[in-house]
C-alpha cells in the first residue's frame, strides 16, 4: 500500500475548503494508493474546522495560532503528518484548487516517469474557461510554464498543487 499525505492550510473559506475536499475524495487513484488529509486551521472564525470535522471526520485537523499563514501552516501539516505515519508522497494543495478527477493520478504517473526523484508541479486553470493557466511552474524572470502534455523543468512554482515524493 502506498500512502499520500495531502496537506492544506485554510483560513475562513469554508465552502471553498469543503469543495476542495469533495474533489480530493473523488480522485481516481491507482490501485494500492490511499490518501490521508492533514488540514491546518490557521485561526478560522467562520466555522471551517467544525464543518470539516463534521463532514470529513477522518481529516486530521491541526490548530494554528492565526499567524502561520500558508507557508508555516503547510510546514506544520508536513511535520505532523511525517511524525504520524510513513508517507510515500506529500501533496500540497491549496483549498481553492478544484481537482479534475484524475489529477493526483496524473501527478503520480509523471513522478513515476522520473523514478520519484523530482517534485511534480501541477498547473491550474481559470475555473470558468479552463483555457487560461492561472498557476504553474516558472522559468527565468516570471516566465510561466504552459502545460504541453510533457514533463518540463521549472525553477520555481506557486504551490497550488504539488506532489513531493518521499525520495526527494
Where are these regions (language model features)?
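A conserved hydrophobic helix/loop-capping motif in glycosyltransferases and polysaccharide synthases
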Residues: 4-16, 20, 27, 40
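Short alpha-helix within the catalytic core of nucleotide-sugar-dependent glycosyltransferases
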Residues: 21-22, 49-50, 75, 101-112
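Short, acidic, metal-binding catalytic loop of nucleotide-sugar glycosyltransferases
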Residues: 23-33
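A conserved acidic beta->alpha catalytic loop
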Residues: 40-50
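Active-site acidic Asp-centered loop
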Residues: 42, 64, 93-95
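Glycine-rich, basic loop-to-helix element that forms the pyrophosphate-binding segment
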Residues: 64-82
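Short beta-strand-to-loop acidic/aromatic patch adjacent to the donor-nucleotide binding site
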Residues: 86-98
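Acidic/His-rich active-site region of diverse nucleotide-sugar glycosyltransferases
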Residues: 98-168
Amino acid at each position: 500500500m502506498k500512502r499520500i499525505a495531502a496537506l492544506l492550510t485554510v483560513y475562513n473559506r469554508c465552502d471553498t475548503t469543503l469543495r476542495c475536499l469533495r474533489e480530493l475524495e473523488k480522485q481516481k487513484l491507482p490501485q494500492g494508493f490511499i490518501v490521508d488529509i492533514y488540514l491546518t486551521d490557521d485561526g478560522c472564525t467562520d466555522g471551517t474546522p467544525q464543518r470539516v470535522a463534521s463532514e470529513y471526520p477522518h481529516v486530521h485537523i491541526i490548530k494554528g495560532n492565526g499567524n502561520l499563514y500558508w507557508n508555516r501552516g503547510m510546514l506544520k501539516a508536513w511535520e505532523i503528518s511525517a511524525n504520524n505515519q510513513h508517507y510515500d508522497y506529500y501533496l500540497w494543495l491549496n483549498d481553492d484548487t478544484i481537482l479534475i478527477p484524475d489529477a493526483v493520478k496524473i501527478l503520480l504517473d509523471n513522478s513515476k516517469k522520473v523514478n520519484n526523484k523530482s517534485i511534480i508541479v501541477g498547473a491550474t486553470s481559470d475555473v470558468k474557461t479552463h483555457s487560461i493557466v492561472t498557476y504553474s511552474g516558472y522559468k527565468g524572470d516570471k516566465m510561466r510554464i504552459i502545460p504541453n502534455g510533457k514533463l518540463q523543468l521549472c525553477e520555481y512554482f506557486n504551490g497550488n498543487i504539488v506532489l513531493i515524493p518521499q525520495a526527494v
